[in-house]
Amino acid sequence: MAILPLADETWARQLPFMVDCFTYWILQKRKQLLQKKKNSDMKKTIVTCTIVAVAITGIWSCSKEIMGRTDNIPALNPSSTDINAGTWKPVLLTGPTDILVATPVATNSPDYIAQINEIKSFQANLTAEEVQIVKYWSAGAVLRWNEILRELVAKHNVPPYQNADGTYPIPNANNPLAYPTFPFSNPPFAARAYGYVSAAQYDALVTAWYYKTTYNRKAPYKVDSSLRVMVATSDLPSYPSEDAVVVGVSVEMLKLLFPGDQEYIQLKAEEHKRARIISGANVRSDIEAGEALGKAVAQKFVARAKGDRAGAAIGNQTIWTKLEDECMARGETPWQSLEIPKRPPMLPVFGKVKSFLFDSLTCVSLVPGPPPLVKSQQMKDELEEVYQQVIHTTREKTAIVHFWADGVGTYTPPGHWDAIAADDFIKKNYSEVRWARNMALLNMSLMDAAIVCWQTKSAYYSPRPTQLNPAIKTLTGVPNFPAYISGHSTFSGAAAAILGHIIPARASAYNAMADEASMSRLYGGLHYKSDCTTGLIVGKNVGNFAIQRAVTDGAE
């Protein structure tokens, strides 16, 4: 079975991205310093900053004790338990009673006392490694499993190499370890993965909260005060365990999406469950009930995923030819792959995938009008603008291009927005169920943005700037699908809209990030301005559907 690379190898893959981020920061500081004073002393300061940047890069690249950005964050300690979350509106379930959870044993029963003693036996022989494991998982179940999902996406975001005859092999979910390994987690695949996992986690936790208040069984440390408590304490009932619920639902969804990584996924699941018992947060029956609940909810989402038409998104030669012919029939120049040999377009039928936030007719209505005609003056002007941006690029613009590139080997643009959201959610001390609700709103927006975006790309099948003007040398890789509309812009518009609703104080910052992500594609020579501006608008229109759901889901 496939195993993820070791942590230091993972960070080695991410090092160029980290350097780009740091370079971007240095450039911002440089600009500020030059604006204040242009003299030799200031130049020395700038040189010093650059030396520091190089030194830090060297330390990162050589250290064998590299830590993740969130490895040392405090334990989740919610400012509110959201005790009434069992009444919140689920995504797929009709209500929490769709899943039955058995009545727990009483806390004074011999069975429960034996489970308390199991915790004590573990705590009597704790190792340093076990303490660290508890600390890691105490940061939050939704956060950690989102990070695991992002890592899996990055691992599998590698396009297959061509066959000897010039054709391209297709990953096979039924034989995931054969080359090319399944999946190729490109942006639309990734957006769908984030959407399904987050929505399923949310429904599972809403159901868990319903049964927590129904049975109201206290946490073990509330029953036996002699237990060592290694996590933040709470008045929230512990049955079923919210962490185990997230384990159960996440494992089943990830097994569907990443079938070749089941050994790694199960390893993380066992580690997570053990951490909750060792920490004194849950007895074993809390864990077992939670995991079973999570798995039951996951099966509802697995059934939906198997029928959402994503399996046909790759299309076939007949469909690919039809898209070209329809474009030429309109008098336009169809998109062509720039790879040698030509690679089929990336998931051209993804626009037919079943969305979460609206129906298929609404999806069609969200598709924007056509791009500028290839022979129009507007297109000539926009093409020239792309060329001028590339040949007159600056270090700052180049850093922006790389910061937002999110290409091969990364967790894709949707994963980048998940990371942005997670960093902000950590500071908010949300409960697990509110974490799940907010991530579901974000990731359903990103998934549905991908659907509308890809429907638009296939509808117009417009060429990339580099196809119309080979003199344009892009600053990052050219994606293998049509230009209009920009995927980065659409994802970013959707993310900024819903995140700005969730955290209004950050709305202007999210919009600024979305604008920068969008413009990065123009700076890099990958998109015309109309691809970017229209993509942002479409994304925000999609995000507004998530906002409509948010104001009616009972959580506000």
Region locations from a protein language model:
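Acidic/polar surface patches and capping/hinge elements
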Residues: 63-556
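Positively charged n-region of N-terminal signal peptides that target proteins for export
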Residues: 42-45
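C-terminal motif of bacterial Sec signal peptides marking the signal peptidase cleavage site
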Residues: 58-61
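Hydrophobic helical h-region of N-terminal Sec-dependent signal peptides
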Residues: 51-56
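Ala/Thr-enriched low-complexity intrinsically disordered regions
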Residues: 2, 7-12, 23
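Cationic, low-complexity basic patches in intrinsically disordered or flexible, solvent-exposed regions
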Residues: 14-15, 32-33
